[in-house]
Structures are given as structure tokens and as C-alpha cells.
């Protein structure tokens, strides 16, 4: 297994035959260069010649440079990308720290790696986040009525869903985040203040590092944008992916003092005047775009991104929940409180499985580097009940932020019952038996739980070893499953099903 530079890229398989886990790879989608004959991965590389002989190699800091691995069938090259910077005679550069450890337990290796990273990049801490987001249910066409109706249901039935977050669509242009468009009849501030008045924390979607050509930022502040090799504003589609809407995007330069001041003022305004304490930052990858030149001479793309993020963190203020989405993974260390760990999820079982796998490979990061955000819990639609339980159980196992993404007013009683159990999650991650992710244990002080996932279509029997006798209770229904002495045997566990059990 190996990480990507940005959120949407992960790699599995073998050295000879690497397999893309994420849909959007660095080489094809973002057009990051690969030397002939090698697969390039980033940040973390896990090798398992046998189950009891495993290696973890990784970069445990990300202050200036990007760490890479070049892979072929018989070679692993450890690479530090210095971005063609010229090193003056007599100068010294501090490279990034490197970690390597061998062992027989995958979870222990990952936990040790996380501990070293956290020493280099202390995390921004907030309590376990629970909330609701408008995007999955309503997209960019969300209305004030949609928000108010769900707010009323949340207040009545799910008051622990503290954050109520409005997503993309409110802004006039990409880049002009305080100039609202036609949505909410131009009154998004009033909606946010209403959320606060009802006792909840307003959240907002922002893509701070990008702008489109219709924006005031682009028209009046071209000096704020990163430049190409001849000094013109860099069109992102000339070096990589140009953006998913209103493209091509241009990129704000995090090393520019004007941009830093703009970021600080923007987020301070949203915190103090709009009362937002939850900031969903999207398109963060562009803040570390390759092929750019910066205001500060000699700056790397990691430094440009981190300089910008430091200004955002300062403006957002103490206790803010800062969620990174479409983010460069390691450059975000210590500068976000939450990290998206998968592609967007849909009410579709293939999507639930695929994003679930992406999330489970990153479980080790949760509550160590940041709070993982496995995307929304989705319980609407017409899927079979077992598939919703697979999805809910998997999200519960990640220990990541719990964000409902449905129009809660339209959920049937059986789905509301699942949501009522999910909001009680405590942010504790399951440790799985292997990277097959068939079953995992959650140890939350004196409370122990077991998560079981059947990824296949057919029913199967699970044999799970235990160290002492126990009784299993279905967490979602309260039903007693049985008592077990030496191993837990779950017969005919339905295909594409999942469950969380209380272990007594």
C-alpha cells in the first residue's frame, strides 16, 4: 500500500503490478511527472513480503519538500523532490525526516509512524465532530427552507449534530467568498446566523486557493496569483487538472503577503460576522500546484501551501474546525483539524464499497494526525437494508467525523433508527485483522465493540478468535446474538452486509 500526494490517489497491489485504489491518479489526472519504468507514490510505503514480515517506510515531516518513492518490480527509490531549486555555495538545506521500521503487526507499525509524525507536526485539536451537511441531499441548489426544515429536525431528534454546514453554491464566483450569489436570495448570512441562534454551529464551504476569471480577485489582484515560467498568471489546466466547475482555475500564492492578509481577513470575517466555526476547505491541492513560481523566491509548493494555510488558521481563530478536502495530504499536517480521506460518496453500493476501502486504509490517521472525514453517512434512497448497514458499520469503524448527508425530514423510521445509533459514535477507530478489512475491534476504555464487514455478494461464516469468553449484542438493534468461548462464529452472515456488536 502507498499514499498519494493528494487525497484522491492511493495505490495497492505489488511492486511489479501496482493497482490504483483512488480514481484520480497523480500521473494521469493531475499530470505529475513519472520517470520511465517507475510508478511514483508519495509519503508512505508499506511492504508485506509475508504477513509476519512487514516494512513501513515514510516521510515523517513535510515542511518544505515532497517525499516520493519510485517503484519498479525490483527497485524502491526513496526520493526528495527539491523542485529544481538552485543551492547556493556553502548553503545548507533541512530535508524532511524519514522513518523506517520492520515488524509483524501492521497496526503497530502505523501507530508508531503516526506518533513520530505528530511530534513533528502537532495536531490542531478539537472535540470529536458531529454534524449535518447540505451537499449530498441538495447540491448547489440548496435553499433556506431546506436548511431550516432540517435544522428543526436536528434540534428535535439529533441535538448532538453540532455543526450545520452549507456547501458550494452560495458564492457569486469562485474566489469572491464574501460576495453572495442568487442562492438564499443573497441572504446566506441570515441563514448562518439563524443556525447559531438555534444553538448550533454554522459551517461554510470555501475554496480559498482558487479563483475563476469572472471573480473580482482575478480581475483586480492578478499580482496575488502564482505565475508561470514567463511571469503570467498560471492557468491550472496548462500543468494539470483545471478544475471541476468554472474552469480553468487560477491559484492564489500563499507566499504573497497580500494573499496572506486576504486569507486572514476572509476567515476572520466568516468567524466573527457570519459566526462560522466549521470551514470546509475545498480544492486545497491547487494551493500546492506544480509548475508555478512564487512571490517569495526559492519557495517550494509545500511552503506556498503551508504559508497560506497558516494565515487561514490564524483568521479562523481558536477552536475552529478546519476540514481539508481535495487536499495535498502531507503538506496539510498540523494545519487542519479534519481531513477528507476518500472520494465523494453516493447512494450506490459500489461507491460505498470503494470509498469505504479508501477510508479504511487511512484509519490509522484518525485522532492522531487529525479527525478523519470519511464523507457523509447516507441513508436515503432504495438500496437493500443490508447495504445501508454495511455502509454505516464501515463509517463507524473509521472513527472519523460523523456527518449526516440526508434530507433528514424524508428519512423513514428504520433509517432514522440507524442514524440515532450512529450519532453516539465516540471517534474511536477499529483495528482490523488485516488489510482485507473483514473484522476489526474497537477498544474504547472499558467498552469493546466488534465490526464485521462482508464485502462479497454471498453469505459467509466468520470465525473470529477471542482471548476470553464473551457475549455479542447487535449495536443497532439491541438483539443478543449469542455467547462464545474460544472463537466467535457468525454463521451465514449475509453478503454485502455489516454490523457493529457490543462485546460483553
For each feature predicted by the language model, list its residue ranges.
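Carbohydrate-recognition beta-sandwich/jelly-roll modules
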Residues: 1-162
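Solvent-exposed beta-hairpin/edge-strand motifs
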Residues: 2-10, 466-479
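Carbohydrate-binding surface patches
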Residues: 39-41, 395-398, 403, 433-468, ...
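Conserved, mostly hydrophobic/aromatic
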Residues: 90, 132, 164, 195, ...
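Aromatic-lined carbohydrate-binding/catalytic grooves of carbohydrate-active enzymes
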Residues: 128-268, 272-278, 284-295
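Glycan-recognition surfaces
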Residues: 219-261, 265, 303-410
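Aromatic- and carboxylate-lined catalytic core of secreted/periplasmic carbohydrate-active enzymes
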Residues: 392-435
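C-terminal beta-strand-rich structural cap/linker in extracellular carbohydrate-active enzymes
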Residues: 484-504
